[in-house]
Every structure is written in structure tokens, then in C-alpha cells.
């Protein structure tokens, strides 16, 4: 059966059609930008844990034939008792011309950096050692920032042209561990769906960790110190890490919050195609890229 167009809030849908529009052109977007897919869907299942991920080019970028600047990450790192899932999103800063490259590389570089410290990282999360987790998170993001600067040099461009946020959830695959690590740098959101209710301020801070007040969002590679948090979960919880294309309407639009609370309830995890359709719930004036990685916490074994 056909799902049809994504549902929308309000009496009328947004003006733009909810389908891919003009592709980015090589002369204007570069070869990397021209090859960024309009839509990405991913997922994984490990024991009682189920993951769905998707990233969709926003209406504004589709209309202007610009590449999607968001990226998503679903990576399995470590080995043995130190195996972890790294679930993340990166949102390329709109004013940075190569932010689509920056967001892709930030996800890949972060997974690699965390893999190199997977043993102590898994131990810090399992032991609820926030200072230890924070130190490892800062080490990893500092490495990502350095490598992004090297990429800028290789391109002959300024590091700020690769500016991107980064938001990662670190999930031990040990079923006995119910603690998750959260690493955030820049805007976006982390939400918890528990017993049908959303907590959309999970891990939120007033001004990030910057000492200087700045109206711009902190972003790699200029900012390299993340905010680190540990989250205790329960069986049946649903955790969402997302870019602000979703976090803003999820926190500010009741129709979006109600729709996704039903769609992503723990009773039935959606398949990848259904998840993509649900993620695209439309609200007028929200036309940015939209990306999310969602973790369903299965029952205790």
C-alpha cells in the first residue's frame, strides 16, 4: 500500500511539494555537494536495541538546488565487552559553503576517534563516570577539530567554511548497562519519549560550554569542547538525537510532538520506510534539513 504524502500540521500543507526537487549542480556545489543524496535512511538491531536513522534535504535547500547539509551516523565501534553503538547527527552551518562536507567528515572522524578509545569509553559509561566520559569526549572532539582543519588546508579553504555541529549518543551493547553517553557541540536536540510523554530538553544547557557569549551556534572546527552528559534509561524508553530541523518543531509544535509520540511509541518499531515517512511530518515555516537517529530501548532481559 502507498503511504502517500507525509502528514502535516495545520489546515494546509506547506507550499513546497514533499519530494526531491532540482539536484545540486557540480559547477555551483562542487562534486562533493552534487553527490550528496537528497535522502538517507539507515538502521540497526542489536539484541533488544533497535535503531532507525534518516536525513532529508529541507524544502529551502531543495528549492535552491543546494545540497543537504545534515549528516547522520550509525556506527558500531570497539570489540568484545567494549562494543558500542555511536548514533549521531551533524548539522552543517548554513552560511559555511562546505558545511555539507564538514558534517559528513565530522561524523566519520568522530566514529574513528571514539573507536580508538572504545575500551575506556565503554568503562566510563558503564560505571557512570561522568568526569572520565567528559575527558574522552573532549579528546575525541579535539581530534575531530584538528583533522577538519587539516581537511581545510588540503582543500585550500578556511576551516570556518567546514563549520558543523555534532551530537552523538554512545550506547554500550552490553545488555546489563542502561547508561548512555551524550556528546553535544552546537545546536540540535536530544529527546526522551517515556510513557507517552516527551522530554525535549535532555542534556540541554544555557550557553553550551563557551566562555564568550556569541549569537552564533558553537561549531567544529572552531569550537572543540563538547558538553558531555550521562543518561540513565529504562526498558521501553525511546531516545532521539536530531538536528534543529526536527528539534525545533518537536519542542514547539504540539501536533508534531503528538504525531511522533504515537509513531515512535515502544509498542511497535517502524520499518525504515515508515520511519522516513514519519520523520517528514510537515509544519509550515520549518523548511530546514531534518535528520534524526532514534533508539528504541527494548525490555530488560
Place the predicted regions along the sequence by residue:
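C-terminal catalytic subdomain
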Residues: 1-25, 210-301
